[in-house]
Amino acid sequence: YIAFRFQFKFSVGAVSALAHDVIITLGVFSLFEIDFDLTVLAAVLAVIGYSLNDTIVVSDRIRENFRKIRKESAVAVINVSLTETLARTLVTSLTTLLVLVALFIFGGELIHGFAIALLVGVFVGTYSSIYVAANVLLLMNIAKEDLMLPVKEGVEVDELP
């Protein structure tokens, strides 16, 4: 979806962020020898969806700013985009984490694995959507030309400021 909706380089960043989230979440379960059951699997799948949604929000802002801020470097555009989405991402993640802490404390023993997986996954997913996906774009040398709309033949294009 991201390769078609945005650009191939964005999809590489998103997949890298998703792999990062899943590996760290499963690593925590392995490190602390926590039982892995179907509820944990459901939580890992939810983490993938949550992280992908965050990554899409950040990627959309990066794409939008590449088209708006034409004279800046890729690093500057990505920095502005991350700054603009940081408050939204942190508030969303913190409210989710508060609910997950309550779920862990009051949810009972059967739901602990689910809550732990989501706690770790949301925390790591927030980090990866901001830092991992954007840095992969920089490593792949994202440029303004990658995101410019194609010019249709015979159509006059207005100059943007």
Question: Model-derived features: where do they sit?
Answer:
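Hydrophobic alpha-helical transmembrane segments of membrane transport and translocation systems
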Residues: 106-161
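Transmembrane alpha-helix detector for multi-pass membrane proteins
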Residues: 41-61, 83, 87, 91-98, ...
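Short helix-capping/hinge motifs at transmembrane helix termini and TM-loop junctions
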Residues: 4-6, 32-34, 106-108, 141-142
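Short helix-terminus and kink motifs of transmembrane alpha helices
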Residues: 6-13, 38, 57-60, 64, ...
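Hydrophobic transmembrane alpha-helices and their membrane-interface caps
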Residues: 10-63, 120
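Pore- and gate-forming transmembrane helices of large, multi-pass membrane proteins
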Residues: 14, 71-106, 116, 122, ...
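Hydrophobic alpha-helical membrane-associated segments
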Residues: 3-4, 20, 50, 54, ...
